[in-house]
C-alpha cells in the first residue's frame, strides 16, 4: 500500500511547511521517510524541533530550494547520501556520511545488541571462526546488490529491485550469496546479456562498500542470516530496523559526521535548535 506521504509533491510539502512555521516557532526537520522520522525523534528535543515527513529525497531537496529562496528560517533537510550528494549544495540540506542511516546503525554497537537479541551465540562464533566478523560478512553480501543499484542508476537500466528480491540468491544454511545467479536475474530484468552486465559492473569506479549498501537490502540479508547461519529466528527486516534504532547509543551518534553537520547548522542558524545541548560522551553503565 502506498503511503500518503509518497504522493506529496515538493510544492505541497512546502505549503505544509509554511503552515507549520506559523504554528511552531522551532526548527523544522524535513526527512525522507517514516524510519528517518522515527530515528530522529529519539535524538532531537521535541520542544525545539518538529520532524516533517517529506515522502522521498526529491521532495526534501525541492522543499529546501524553496526555503533557500528566502521564505523563512529554521528549516533543515536531511537526506540519504545514496550514491552521491545532492546535485545542488545548500546550507540547509545535509546528507548521511554513508549510503543511509541504516549504514550508520549497522556500523555501531547496535548491531552487536541485535545479534545478542536475535542470534545464537554458538552459531555466530562458529560462523565467525570460518568467515570473519558478522559485520564485515554482512556488508560483503550487501555490496553486490548495492553495485547493481548503482549501475542501474548510472546507466538508467530500470532494474526492478522489488521483483529482483534477495532471498533467491542465498543458501540459507551457510548464508552464502550466489553472485552469478543474482547478476543473471538482474540482466533478465533489464533485458541485457549477463556477460554485458558483468562487464558494466566491472567498469564501475571503486567505492567504499558502506557507501554502496542500501539499508533495506542489508536488513533483509541480515534477517536471512539469522534464520539458520547466525541463529534460529526470523524477526524480519522491519523489526530488525526498529531494534537497531532502539539500541543505537547517543554517544555513538555524537561521534558521527551527521551529528557534526547538524551542530554546524545550529551554530549558523541561532536560535534554532535540533539536538539536546549535551549528549553523554559514553554510554550509560
Show the residue positions of the predicted features.
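Acidic, divalent-metal-binding catalytic cores of TOPRIM
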Residues: 1-285
